[in-house]
């Protein structure tokens, strides 16, 4: 008798490789290092430097990075199509675009992006070994552990790292690798363990709205062009 396992309600993380000229890549890294300036990280010790909290959150508006942003936006639309969206009935907006630079022994703690709907990260460095710190995606729900907390281990009966009870999924950075995932998904970046390597990436936050024309669906925000600033309202 066969026991058939049905893996339901998958969370989709998409990956692809962008073709980036090595000379352009080196230039992008130099620009990002210049934007970081004398800073070595974020205020918390051991944290990577992230542009979003240091005033560098609109890289897509800089001519140097606009072509990269366009490529990423195209892949974001492909992601929407792949998970079932009719792209003629939504508008996709790029909210933020910022660099993340991680020197040796620096990391990014577990977090998600509640202000956005779809997020992406484009790696400018990495050789696939993971030594510079992997991207770790955290499972939002451990349905298959049956008993809450059991999959955490500590001598429990569930096989360690079993694919049906995995708490995390790791992805090693490579230059040109693009990753897209739901913004609500918790993720982190493990410590850069290579004292000779800089881990460099660019993050993107996208938001969905209804198209500018037509009536918006019930659960999709109207297009921002149809919003009104409350301070500008008159009686």
Regions found by a protein language model. Name each.
Residues 79-83, 94, 99-109:
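Short acidic (Asp/Glu) patches
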Residues 97-99, 120-122, 202-206:
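A structural signal for short, well-ordered beta-strand segments
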Residues 88-90:
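Histidine-dependent nucleotide/RNA phosphoesterase domain, centered on the 2H-phosphoesterase fold
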Residues 31-33, 135-140, 152, 217-227:
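Short intrinsically disordered coil segments
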Residues 100-178, 212:
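Catalytic core of non-heme Fe(II) oxygenases with the double-stranded beta-helix
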Residues 2-86, 107:
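Non-heme Fe(II)/2-oxoglutarate
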Residues 93, 111-113, 187:
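Histidine-centered active-site/metal-ligand motif
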Residues 159-235:
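Catalytic core of Fe(II)/2-oxoglutarate
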């Amino acid at each position: 008798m066969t026991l058939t396992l049905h893996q339901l309600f998958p969370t989709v993380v998409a990956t692809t490789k962008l073709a980036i000229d090595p000379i352009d890549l080196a230039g992008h890294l130099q620009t990002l290092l210049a934007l970081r300036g004398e800073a070595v990280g974020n205020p918390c010790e051991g944290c990577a430097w992230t542009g979003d909290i240091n005033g560098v959150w609109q890289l897509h508006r800089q001519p140097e990075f606009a072509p990269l942003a366009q490529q990423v936006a195209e892949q974001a639309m492909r992601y929407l199509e792949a998970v079932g969206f009719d792209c003629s009935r939504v508008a996709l907006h790029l909210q933020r675009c910022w660099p993340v630079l991680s020197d040796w022994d620096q990391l990014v703690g577990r977090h998600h992006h509640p202000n956005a709907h779809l997020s992406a990260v484009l790696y400018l460095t990495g050789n696939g070994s993971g030594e510079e710190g992997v991207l770790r995606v955290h499972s939002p729900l451990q349905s298959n552990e049956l008993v809450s907390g059991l999959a955490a281990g500590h001598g429990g009966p569930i096989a360690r790292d079993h694919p049906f009870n995995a708490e995390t999924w790791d992805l090693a950075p490579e230059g040109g690798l693009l990753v897209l995932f739901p913004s609500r998904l918790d993720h982190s970046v493990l410590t850069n363990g290579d004292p000779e390597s800089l881990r460099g990436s660019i993050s993107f936050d996208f938001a969905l709205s209804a198209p500018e024309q037509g009536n918006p669906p019930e659960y999709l925000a109207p297009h921002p062009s149809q919003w009104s600033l409350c301070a500008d309202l008159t009686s």
